[in-house]
């Protein structure tokens, strides 16, 4: 079973991100489940959503405590909440920012992690440019798809199409395509740095 935990704030589409991820996995023939965990339910409050993906029926219903991947929609949570709790050294991390992990003050933390499983994506910037709103979820899911290979960009795009009206979906798919290419380019840089 592959488990994903998504951190963000109310109003950023955290729950929708988990739902779209589960739809994308389902479209690829997997079993999937998505659900949120709310603190105080207000715009701007920290929100966590979870997604599990497996080939077999999923019977677990509790929050994801040992994620295989973490998607962080709001980088201001990095030093306020233990967003990395339970992540294994083999885990994937996708953060919504144009800054590097070092610039975020995470250089020491990531030293024990696999660099090829870490990326940042300027998802809010992409959403503002292509969607006209600061909702980074579609771009981050595409970034996750590029980084992990667990789902395809085509499935992410189809899931976006299922969640949003046509015009909004098209704009989000554009942001997702740009984010996917962004992460692939970042990954090439990591590969060159490791072999160089």
What is each model feature region?
Residues 1-196:
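Active-site cofactor/cluster-binding pocket
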């Amino acid at each position: 079973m592959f488990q994903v935990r998504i951190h963000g704030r109310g109003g950023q589409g955290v729950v929708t991100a988990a739902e779209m991820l589960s739809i994308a996995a389902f479209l690829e023939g997997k079993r999937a489940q998505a659900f949120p965990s709310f603190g105080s339910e207000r715009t701007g409050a920290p929100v966590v959503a979870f997604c599990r993906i497996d080939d077999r029926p999923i019977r677990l219903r509790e929050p994801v405590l040992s994620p295989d991947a973490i998607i962080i929609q709001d980088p201001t949570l990095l030093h306020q909440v233990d967003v990395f709790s339970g992540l294994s050294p083999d885990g994937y991390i996708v953060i919504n920012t144009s800054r590097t992990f070092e610039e975020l003050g995470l250089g020491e933390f990531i030293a024990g992690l696999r660099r090829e499983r870490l990326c940042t994506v300027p998802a809010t910037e992409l959403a503002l440019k292509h969607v006209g709103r600061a909702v980074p979820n579609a771009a981050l899911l595409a970034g996750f798809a590029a980084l992990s290979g667990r789902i395809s960009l085509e499935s992410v795009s189809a899931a976006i199409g299922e969640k949003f009206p046509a015009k909004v979906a098209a704009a989000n798919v554009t942001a997702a395509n740009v984010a996917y290419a962004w992460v692939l380019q970042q990954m090439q840089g990591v590969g060159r740095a490791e072999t160089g």
